[in-house]
Amino acid sequence: MTEKTASHYWNEETSILKLRRKDILLFEIYATTLLLGSIYSIYVDKWSITSYFGNSKNLINLIFVKRGWFWTSLVYFYHAWDQKRNKIDFKFISRYIVATLWWMFVTQWFIGPGLIDRTFALSGGSCKNFDGDSSVFIPLTASTCKGLNGSWSGGHDLSGHVFLLTHSSLFMLSENFSFILNNGIKATSTKVLFGLLGLWWWMLFVTASFYHTTFEKCTGFFSGILEWSIVYVFSSRMPAVADLLGSSDY
C-alpha cells in the first residue's frame, strides 16, 4: 500500500454511520485500552497497591499527567513548527483554541467550577471536615477542598485523568494522522510526538486499572471524545463548524 493509497484508505467513509476508517480506529484504540484496564482492575487489590504506577504520587503522574495539557500543547506546537509551519494558519490555531477551551471547561472553569467539580457537587458530593467555618465558607472545588485539608467525597467523580489523556491523544492524532501516513516517523519532532502519545496511552491504561469506578471512567471517556467527535468526526456534516475550523487532513 503506497503512502497516498494509505492516506486515502484511512480517510474513506465506511457503512458505519458514514464514519471514516481512521475515526473508527482511533475510537477503538482508546475504548479498548479503557476496557482492558477495567478488566485488569478486577484482579487488582486497590487497597494494597505495590505497583509504582499504581501510586498516584509517582513522578510521571506528578510531572507529566498533572500538567498534561501543558505537555500536549508544547509537543503539539513543537511538531507543528518543525514539520508543518506553512500550515499554521487561523483555522489551525482555532482548532487548538477549541480543544483548549474544552479542556478548561471540563477541568478548570465553567462559569465557576469546572464540569468535573460541578458534576461531583450536583451528584451529592461536597467537601467534608475541612479547616474553616462551614457556616461562612464551603469549598466548591476539589483543589480548594484539598488545600483546606478536607475530604472531597460523596459524589460522582468523573475521571479527570481519563478525560485528559483521551482528549489530548485524540487531538494530537487527529491533527497529525494523515501527515504521519505520508511522512512516516523520521523527524525528531515526530518521534517526540509519538513518545508523548505512548506515555499518555500507558497512563490511560494505568488509570483504568487502578482508579475510579467503571461509570466514572466511562463519563471521563465520553467527555474526552465529545469535542473530538464534533470537531474531527462530524464537522463535515456541520457546515458552520467546517467553515470556521477547517480540516486537519494535511
Curated annotation (Swiss-Prot):
Determine the domain of life of the protein's source: Eukaryota
The entry's keywords? Endoplasmic reticulum, Glycoprotein, Hydrolase, Lipid biosynthesis, Lipid metabolism, Membrane, Phospholipid biosynthesis, Phospholipid metabolism, Transmembrane, Transmembrane helix
Provide the E.C. number(s) assigned to this enzyme: 3.6.1.-
Enzyme class, spelled out: hydrolase
Residues at the active site: 161, 212
Q: Lumenal compartment: which residues?
A: 45-58, 117-160, 213
This one is known as Acyl-coenzyme A diphosphatase fit1
Q: Does the keyword Lipoprotein apply?
A: no
What's the name of its gene? fit1
Origin species: Schizosaccharomyces pombe (strain 972 / ATCC 24843) (Fission yeast)
Q: In which compartments does the protein localize? A: Endoplasmic reticulum membrane
